[in-house]
Amino acid sequence: MNSKQEKLAAFERLLDIMDELRAKCPWDKKQTFESLRYLTIEETYELGDAILNSNLSEIKKELGDLLLHIVFYAKLGSEKQVFDIADVANNISDKLIYRHPHIYGNLKVNNENDVKKNWEALKLKEGKNRVLGGVPKGLPSIVKAQRIQEKAAGVGFDWDKSEQIWLKVQEEITEFEEEVSKGDLKRSEEEFGDVLFSLINYARFLKINPDNALELTNQKFIERFDFIESKAKQLEKKLSDMSLSEMEAIWKESKNQSSSPDSNNC
């Protein structure tokens, strides 16, 4: 791997390229914080895909794209004479040192949970006077629910056992079924939200990432549906002309293939 000096040289090279692009490239010269925002979100999701696919080559590539965005934002900040990349790096370094007193101070912790609780306590001391105030409003709903639950748990508002949460899940499902039977769409939607929130909480307790779990299922469904499409082409049929029973038979074939010992599919 590269030495520390080589890493610093590579980062300096990126900074120099950013300066030159900002000065000479018509596209780069036009960019603002606002215009880059949606591109940054897209790059973040592409990194997430690479991680889920365990593709180290793509992870490296997508990390580079995100690093470019960080450098770009810092360049924009420096042009406004508000902050530069050194300020960004020093700010996060200061934060890490402050929030890790068990490493850089005298605080004693026994486990990971102690670290998380102390982290949230320090955030409150910093002026973030609401525990859930730091959860971004724009987070995807599943991720937001997980972060809400983690932050609440960080100050002791949590269940003792996973069995308690599972009972809560069953309770919420019963309430949802009752509203569905009444035909009340608004109340059904609310209760369905409660079911999802409880399931996400149960997953958290089991140390399952619910967003990752759902995305793996999404990918599995896509692969199996692609299999149906491929089979339909082999049979010279359109999906719209196939019966549900025909498609279900091919679906089962796909499941059998993906569960075989020699298969690497989901």
State where each predicted segment sits.
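Flexible "arm" and connector segments at domain edges
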Residues: 1-62, 68-192, 196-266
